[in-house]
Amino acid sequence: MAKKSLKVKQSRPNKFSVRDYTRCLRCGRARAVLSHFGVCRLCFRELAYAGAIPGVKKASW
């Protein structure tokens, strides 16, 4: 889980736009964030298995 200080730091506007980075809206993780859904891969997996994301299901071939 992300530290509280990092979440606060990310919510403030950056001085330079290059410093912007995405964080998971659910847990605050900074890596492996799926921009289309706004959550990290771990939260995406949990939500997909729970059926909370419409149109997403486990692939098998």
Curated annotation (Swiss-Prot):
SUPFAM superfamilies: Glucocorticoid receptor-like (DNA-binding domain). One of its GO terms (molecular function) is zinc ion binding. Gene3D superfamilies: 30s Ribosomal Protein S14, Chain N (4.10.830.10). Zn(2+) binds at residues 24, 27, 40, 43. Pfam families: Ribosomal_S14 (PF00253). One of its GO terms (cellular component) is cytoplasm. PROSITE patterns: RIBOSOMAL_S14. It comes from the Bacteria. Keywords: Metal-binding, Ribonucleoprotein, Ribosomal protein, RNA-binding, rRNA-binding, Zinc. GO terms for biological process: translation. Its cofactor is Zn(2+). Binds 16S rRNA, required for the assembly of 30S particles and may also be responsible for determining the conformation of the 16S rRNA at the A site. Belongs to the universal ribosomal protein uS14 family. Zinc-binding uS14 subfamily. This is Small ribosomal subunit protein uS14. It comes from Mycoplasma genitalium (strain ATCC 33530 / DSM 19775 / NCTC 10195 / G37). The lineage of its organism: Bacteria, Bacillati, Mycoplasmatota, Mycoplasmoidales, Mycoplasmoidaceae. The gene is rpsZ.
